[in-house]
């Protein structure tokens, strides 16, 4: 174990396992209330999955939207997330995530100095469901100067190497082809970071300012637990590390160790579908889940993950192969996705979580996969306009791209019937000319259009023909950002035992826990939004403070949010 901040101690009020956004929110919130806190990170780098994420938060009825004149209500948001979760989410967690999110946001801004940008037109992912809105619920961190915030610690925060720009700037610039790359290079040299790394940097700086200690290479192995169960006064009083070191917690241990996607035996035994790749840190091996299970914690939702279509391109993290998320590669006008039969099988522009589920389909009569192997297919003109991942036209074709001079040649190389691929492209090209996709309705929703090209010469920003050879294919596999089921908690982030009673002294947040939205993915930031809210609620509960936060500003929906939350949360407390 290496202390990066503070000197080693054997006892703290609060021990936080993990250093992602949920962990740091819990740590900073508790430290702000005067608690002594230590953050213990398993890896040598801080930030976990959060640091390499998009950094966005899905917060319904947030004050930024209200101040901009955007009309949103907790009622509408709850109706929406109930539909997105397909009836599988627990009402207590839904209420906590939806009605306490803005309290978390205002607390971070006013008490901890974390700053955010409001995205006015980033649509909810499922525009077809009741309660969805076409903007206002997603926010993102502002650009942050990580060197100014953290000094020498800046290099200890994970990075995915992305250029420092916000999604608001992406909207303003319109497409990657118009990015001011020289300006972005200058920003990076000046220490500016964006997205998840900016969020983690601001949260980490806040926790340190409030007195939290931080250590790395500190893998938790076992909880110190007195008693046989919640009904006999059992309590978690600390943690034993893999190194054998013991750290006592006088008030609480917070598990925020990430998911279990990198433990292949756990993933294969729990997830509903085979996970072929992921892009999270390899340290996400279910440590916190096992620790909690050993003392009788309840688990829920472990069949699910934050699914996403990915490709294997040779990217690595901590020396391990990872998947690369496919976004514009499948959403831009002039590309399609075909299955093992050479046919389109879904709206390629839909959100990544739902599209990945289409990769999981099984053909029972044939006893084989229905749609995989699957490939994104595009032509030379697409490559010249947009590039694909980091590859640009004129460069040698990378190994992960399959090239064919003609569609039949490409079909032979990817193992699909040539006549099907040719017919599929011809049919899609006709749709591109008219601007309508009667097969899968691509380009109809605000979400589809958001990720299209507003300058597309064809009628629909999401549709364009594939006409100019050579043609290219990129294999698509079922991937995930991480798992999103695990330790069950109540609406205050207290871990529940198998009988549904809170385990004293134990809290959990983040991907180590059951998702508030169950199998659903409401919109951009639906991972970080609720997990940071639960981190805030954990910190407030440990400190004996109210869940709500009043910064003295007028909040039109504050009473409404309280009215909605209190009955559900009060019932859970009983």
From Swiss-Prot:
Inhibited by 5,5'-dithio-bis(2- nitrobenzoate) and N-bromosuccinimide, but not by thiol and chelating reagents. Its cofactor is FAD. Optimum pH is 7.2. Optimum pH is 7.6. It catalyses: 4-oxocyclohexane-1-carboxylate + O2 = 4-oxocyclohex-2-ene-1-carboxylate + H2O2. It holds the Pfam family FAD_binding_2. Its EC number is 1.17.3.5. Keywords: FAD, Flavoprotein, Oxidoreductase. The keyword Transmembrane does not apply. One of its GO terms (molecular function) is steroid dehydrogenase activity, acting on the CH-CH group of donors. GO terms for biological process: steroid metabolic process. Induction: Induced by CHCA, trans-4-hydroxyCHCA and 4-oxoCHCA but not by 4-hydroxybenzoate (4-HBA). The keyword Flavoprotein applies. PANTHER family: 3-OXOSTEROID 1-DEHYDROGENASE, FUMARATE REDUCTASE. Desaturase involved in a cyclohexanecarboxylate (CHCA) degradation pathway. Catalyzes the conversion of 4-oxocyclohexanecarboxylate (4-oxoCHCA) to 4-oxocyclohexenecarboxylate. Is highly specific for 4-oxocyclohexanecarboxylic acid and shows only slight activity with 4-oxo-2-methylcyclohex-2-enecarboxylic acid. Monomer. Homodimer. Belongs to the FAD-dependent oxidoreductase 2 family. This is 4-oxocyclohexanecarboxylate 2-dehydrogenase. It comes from Sinomonas cyclohexanicum (Corynebacterium cyclohexanicum).
């Amino acid at each position: 174990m290496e202390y990066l901040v503070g000197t080693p101690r054997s006892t703290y009020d609060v021990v936080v396992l993990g250093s992602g956004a949920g962990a740091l929110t819990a740590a900073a919130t508790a430290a702000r209330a005067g608690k002594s806190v230590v953050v213990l990170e398993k890896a040598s780098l801080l930030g976990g999955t959060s640091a390499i994420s998009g950094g966005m938060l899905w917060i319904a009825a947030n004050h930024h939207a209200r101040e901009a004149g955007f009309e949103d209500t907790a009622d509408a948001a709850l109706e929406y997330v109930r539909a997105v979760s397909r009836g599988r989410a627990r009402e207590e967690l839904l209420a906590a995530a939806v009605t306490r999110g803005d309290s978390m946001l205002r607390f971070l801004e006013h008490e901890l100095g974390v700053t955010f940008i409001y995205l006015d037109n980033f649509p909810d992912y499922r525009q077809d469901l009741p309660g969805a809105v076409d903007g206002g619920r997603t926010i993102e961190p502002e650009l942050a100067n990580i060197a100014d915030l953290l000094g020498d610690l800046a290099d200890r925060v994970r990075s995915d190497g992305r250029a420092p720009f916000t999604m608001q700037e992406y909207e303003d610039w319109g497409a990657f082809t118009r990015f001011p790359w020289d300006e972005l290079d200058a920003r990076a040299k000046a220490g500016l970071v964006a997205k998840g790394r900016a969020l983690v940097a601001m949260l980490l700086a806040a926790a340190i300012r409030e007195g939290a200690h931080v250590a790395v290479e500190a893998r938790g192995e076992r909880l110190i637990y007195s008693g046989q169960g919640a009904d006999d006064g059992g309590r978690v009083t600390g943690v034993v590390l893999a190194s054998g070191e013991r750290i006592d917690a006088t008030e609480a241990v917070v598990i925020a160790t990430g998911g279990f996607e990198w433990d292949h035996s756990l993933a294969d035994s729990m997830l509903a579908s085979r996970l072929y790749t992921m892009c999270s840190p390899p340290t996400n091996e279910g440590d916190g889940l096992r620790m909690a299970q050993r003392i009788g914690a309840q688990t829920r939702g472990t069949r699910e993950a934050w699914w996403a279509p990915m490709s294997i391109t040779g990217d690595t993290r901590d020396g391990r192969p990872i998947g690369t998320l496919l976004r514009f590669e499948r959403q831009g006008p002039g590309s399609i996705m075909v299955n093992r039969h050479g046919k389109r099988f879904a709206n390629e522009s839909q959100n990544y979580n739902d599209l990945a589920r289409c990769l999981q389909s099984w053909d029972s009569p044939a006893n084989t996969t229905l749609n995989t192997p699957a490939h994104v297919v595009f032509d030379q003109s697409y490559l010249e306009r947009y590039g694909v991942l980091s590859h640009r036209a004129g460069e040698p074709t990378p190994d992960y791209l399959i090239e064919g001079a003609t569609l039949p040649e490409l079909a032979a190389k990817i193992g699909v019937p040539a006549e099907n691929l040719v017919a599929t492209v011809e049919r899609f090209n006709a749709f591109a000319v008219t601007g309508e996709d009667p097969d899968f309705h691509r380009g109809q929703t605000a979400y589809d259009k958001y990720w299209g090209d507003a300058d597309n010469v064809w009628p629909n920003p999401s549709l364009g023909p594939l006409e100019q050879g050579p043609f290219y294919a990129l294999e698509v596999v079922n991937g995930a950002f991480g798992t999103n089921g695990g330790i069950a908690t109540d609406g205050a982030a207290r871990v529940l035992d198998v009988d549904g009673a809170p385990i004293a002294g134990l809290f959990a947040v983040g991907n180590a826990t059951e998702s508030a939205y169950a199998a659903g993915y409401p919109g951009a930031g639906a991972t970080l939004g609720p997990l940071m809210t639960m981190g805030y609620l954990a910190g407030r509960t440990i400190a004996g403070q109210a869940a709500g936060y009043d910064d003295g500003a007028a909040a039109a929906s504050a009473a409404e949010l309280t009215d909605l939350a209190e009955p559900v949360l009060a019932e859970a407390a009983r």
